[in-house]
Amino acid sequence: MKKINYILAVILTISSFGTFAQSQKINTEKSTINWLGKKIGGQHEGLINIKSGELEEKGGKIVSGSFVIDMTSITNTDLTDASYNQKLVGHLKSDDFFGIEKFPTANLNITKATKFSNGKASVTGDVTIKGKTETITFDIVKKGNSYSAKIEIDRSKHNVRFGSTSFFDSLGDKAIDDLFILDIKLVVS
């Protein structure tokens, strides 16, 4: 009888490990954020670094997550002319766009998620850019110790006004799409 009780205690102890949340730090060296912004007649793209972050999983779903994005690290990868590249990056860092002197970071905080099914889940979270917060929902894919997501963000919700038809009329071919895309690859350790 003691042996059966001991075996049951061991089984219960082992099975209870699966119910605890597992916190995982984001490996900022291996994780990437590619951005894409479109305008009439073209587009630009580049990279932004993740400063810090973590994900917490429990029972096959993300229960929380927070990420700090280093807006001072924004780069452009499609312009090969150094002068034009510098000009664009400087403009993106200026108050016309992300105002990095006042807002050096952006944040994403996951508030809820569905359970992973075939490696995919739906995530809802709050994204804060330039001090303005918007709730967004997006799909995330998990493969091993990495996660990927493509997130569309409406810059007009974050007071990023330059070239936006949401704020200015008669921009014609100078208009820049309000939506920009973040293609995120997270590696946890």
Q: What are the residue ranges of the model-derived segments?
A:
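Bacterial Sec-dependent N-terminal signal peptides
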Residues: 1-24
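Low-complexity, acidic/polar, glycine-enriched regions of mature
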Residues: 21-189
